[in-house]
Amino acid sequence: MRADDNPSARSLHAQFPGDDTRPTSKKELAGWYSYGWAAEVFTVCAMGSFLPITLEQMARDRGVLLSDKVTPCSASWNGTETTARTHGISPPWYGINATPGTSQCVVYILGAEINTASFAMYTFSVSVFVQAVLIISMSGAADHGSFRKTLLVAFAVIGSVCTMLFLSVVPKIYIVGALFAIVANTCFGASFVLLNSFLPLLVRHHPSLLGHENERSPELNHSHITDDRVQFAANADYGIDADATSPLLQPVQGDSDEHTTSRLPVTSVVISEELKLSTRISSLGIGIGYIGAVILQIICILVIIATRQTTFSLRLVLFLIGLWWFVFTIPAALWLRPRPGPPLPKAPQGKDNRSCVGYMVYAWKSLCRTAVRTRHLKDILLFLTAWFLLSDGIATVSGTAVLFAKTQLNMKPAALGLINVVTMMAGVFGAFSWSFVSRRLNLGASQTIIACILLFELIPIYGLLGFVPAIRKLGYLGLQQPWEMFPLGIVYGLVMGGLSSYCRSFFGELIPPGNEAAFYALYAITDKGSSIFGPAIVGLITDRYGEIRPAFVFLAVLIFLPLPLMLLVDVGRGKKDALALAVELEEGQSSNTQTYGTLSNCERNAVPTDQ
């Protein structure tokens, strides 16, 4: 009989009052997988395809042409089709090219003239900002007490309902659509942080590992597993730590509380088993989520074609995405156990800080403490700066490309959705192929990242070729025809497949041993926070020049800037500095008194998107 089929498997000792030490059940695992299947569709199908063009289209339906600022706008693909048919041309299903700038539209919000494409970019920037603030602020409440599952379900319901409500949003109230988009994206990010926080608990309490309990140190059941090999390798896919209580905010060396004891070594048997199990569960979760996203993406494309690719078609597929998210959240709500965390530590004055304000202060102080420690680590600062710029470029290129294809190339929604399918398939291929290429060419992690950046740089440079007079005369190349978006989507997918794994791996080599959770938190916040700026700047450029193509200059610079920073990172020096800091923190541990908070571990918001 397999271990996970054994209902009599022993549970671990409780580490705090109310600790749920029951073995992980198959139903609980199914609930965890179910939410990945439910929510991944939002980042892939909504944020990656249909939400940006829906916002742009609803604003367009209320806007006027940029050329005369009087003529009302209409759907770019419908308007172009009418022109094509007038000249006896049968337009293809994917759209037809138009003269750049002829279909650019503007709307007036609070007296300001805003390009309809910029409106979608500004909405994305605001949603990312709100998401980052919420994720940090709610971390304390998610870690301590029994709020983890409650918050996950609440965010899932709110986010999915807001997505479904797009069906009722008509162009006349397009601003309401932007508000729904902000709330939905914020709730998605927060819910996935909470989902990822369950994985270490599911692994730790899995029946197949409880048989190795005797091989642990006797005190291990009352300590956090912090071996750096486990912290990174076991959870590289989801970017989370493998500690016992799985907090979003957790103690590290130099901090202590009444629920944390000294760090103890873990036997190689336990490390190996937890590593294998965590990798298996997380990989399966990612695969299930992407399979669901591809299935729904194809369904959405068929629905859009069947409903003649109108604004209503876009609202309808967003309703379907929200409905999918809501329905498949139900098994997660029923089958996942709350798995509460330890009580919130008391403040230095001995006061109980379990109010909402107390939880938020706890979280922000923890994050700040981690940020302060990075000043001792030059190479981590260099890498995080590079990652800030690179992740901003990743998010901005995705949104910019979709809106460029719609407003400049007049591509139809079905074709835009198909680009996303092609990109996802290329991303899966890239995740495996980069590993093969790096081994074949004997490339290190940093060299592979640099290769990805150079390949990534080709995307905006290719778009800038459209400014070259000789190429413009050709009528193709330089992103002048819709079909050119598909090979660029393949390039983007290949790049994402490499960067998503190698950047995290490279960063892991620079972290002080025993501080993985805290520094991966900073890594994730850097990732999320950076996406505030790129889309907003692209929006400003689009408003200034009346079209998106000039923004490729900004994107080319944004993608290039991480390159010299990555070349300055010295792994050997970084490891040496990290070890020195770890020793310093270890030596100071015995002299530390009770602190208010612990270091933030918001790294659990690393998803796949996209986004």
Curated annotation (Swiss-Prot):
InterPro entries: Atg22 (IPR044738), Atg22-like (IPR024671), ATG22/LtaA_families (IPR050495), MFS_trans_sf (IPR036259). Pfam families: ATG22. This is Autophagy-related protein 22-2. Keywords: Amino-acid transport, Autophagy, Glycoprotein, Membrane, Transmembrane, Transmembrane helix, Transport, Vacuole. It comes from the Eukaryota. GO terms for biological process: amino acid transmembrane export from vacuole; autophagy. The chain crosses the membrane at residues 35-55, 116-136, 151-171, 175-195, 286-306, 316-336, 380-400, 414-434, 449-469, 483-503, 521-541, 551-571. It is a multi-pass membrane protein. Vacuolar effluxer which mediate the efflux of amino acids resulting from autophagic degradation. The release of autophagic amino acids allows the maintenance of protein synthesis and viability during nitrogen starvation. Glycans are attached at N78, N221, N353. It is found in: Vacuole membrane. GO terms for cellular component: vacuolar membrane. Residues 1-24 are annotated as: Disordered. It comes from Aspergillus clavatus (strain ATCC 1007 / CBS 513.65 / DSM 816 / NCTC 3887 / NRRL 1 / QM 1276 / 107). Belongs to the ATG22 family.
